[in-house]
């Protein structure tokens, strides 16, 4: 292991199995230290995605939530620490998955009781791949003024009291997380404070040992002395003894092994941790303390004397000029949360909406980060605005031109279709523009204009699975599903839909690939062998060509394409386009002052 620092002021982590308080404490520590970016880059919650709202100082931020470790690592390649709050049942599997990600360098396992066989596998893999495991059964670690893991060092008040908001000169490592909090306070009282502190965890087989971190501290110039707090049970301390004897550590080490009282008991005693139990003589606290003394460590006569030993060692370093004075800073005040601040009037209230597509807080609105003035000055069109507000990126001009063509071709299709009919009837009833528009829009669905998304889904699935038109169509037939995007009440083989022809012509001339459109055409060829009106309609044309636009632009991942189709972007295109015509029909009826519409009796079949 060895090498040097694990963390810095720019270190970011992925947090597995979301727990609100530890994450918020990390972010509060970040703010206290004056970090510019939050230390939590993303949260992994198996089975859920989205954003989690948390506070970074006075501002509320949205931290991405990912369903899988692989997706989180891909989305946040600079995050190299994995903080695992999974239960002992799943901690090993998720930790191994994290270790196998090339971007992850450090894994902290909080859970206690991870099977020892699983822990051994994690240790072996980490060592073979030059990675670091902290834990299991750990509270984590901290680099003062830079980064902390989860609940390390406790509350903000304790962190301030221990001066952990700025770096000191002492490297500290212990097995116990609870005792590490006590020792941070002790070190702060008699020295200039902690530089880095690690709790390796109390299980029998820790992922990294006391000596691993002492050797690492020895390579960090800012650390001038080390403090070690071991405990009875196991032989971890002896690896530190060997390192001291071999001269691998050239900085003062103050050490104490807790558990000297175990000899007062007649039988074996199990203390708090799995690894803290009295066993053979070599595992006793007395034997370990003596071995550390013999190796050159500074070991007091009791735990009560540990503070004095640390103080004397530090003062000696100061006298020798090996420690430079630390510049004290005043940490910022962390805002209180709402419930605790109501009485005092110090409040920060959570937001209720997350928006990622536009921002109107500056001097001018921005669409996906592009200022309104730039949109006008650079000659953006409606298609460009849609690409920013719908897809959150600037698409190539041929893509935005295609969007504009779709809008123009789908703006209206006469007064006889269901949407226009409803709008006309509503307008003639004296209703307002919005009511008339909505009346028409509500007819859009699987039978009228709303088949674009379904057409895209089915064509994509069939094409991606290399189904022949026969397999695709007959498979749909067996399921009792009509093929979306195929069939028209008016158009036929001999009377093609001009809109479809125009879209296909544009795509063949401008798209880098029309794979999905060509597949839709082969499906049309097959369906026309069954009936003359089973032509590719405008829904099918837009659906298949939009797949080609998304895939051919090179600006979308497969997952993003699937999400776009699933959410209903393509039907949104028809809704937007047809709104133009429906508004036109509303104005037309009102301008013509048409009376209330009543359907004629002769057009109704009255039957029992």
Swiss-Prot record:
Set out the biological process GO terms recorded for this chain's protein.
acetyl-CoA biosynthetic process; lipid metabolic process
Compartments in which it is found: Cytoplasm, Cytosol
Where do the annotations place Mg(2+) binding?
Answer: 231
- Claim: Lyase is one of the keywords in the record: no
Q: What is its EC number?
A: 2.3.3.8
Q: What stretches pass through the bilayer?
A: none
| CDD domains on file | CCL_ACL-C
Active site located where?
273 (tele-phosphohistidine intermediate)
Which residues bind ATP per the record? 214-234, 265-291
InterPro entries recorded: Cit_synth/succinyl-CoA_lig_AS, Citrate_synth-like_lrg_a-sub, Citrate_synth-like_sm_a-sub, Citrate_synthase, Citrate_synthase_sf, Citrt_syn/SCS-alpha_CS, NAD(P)-bd_dom_sf, Succ-CoA_synthase_bsu_CS
Chief subcellular location equals: cytoplasm
Matching entries from Pfam families are given as:
Citrate_synt, Ligase_CoA
Disulfide pairs here are none
Q: Which reaction does it catalyse?
A: oxaloacetate + acetyl-CoA + ADP + phosphate = citrate + ATP + CoA
In alphabetical order, the GO MF annotations are: ATP binding; ATP citrate synthase activity; metal ion binding
Sorted alphabetically, the keyword list is: Acyltransferase, ATP-binding, Cytoplasm, Lipid biosynthesis, Lipid metabolism, Magnesium, Metal-binding, Nucleotide-binding, Transferase
Name-wise, this protein is ATP-citrate synthase beta chain protein 2
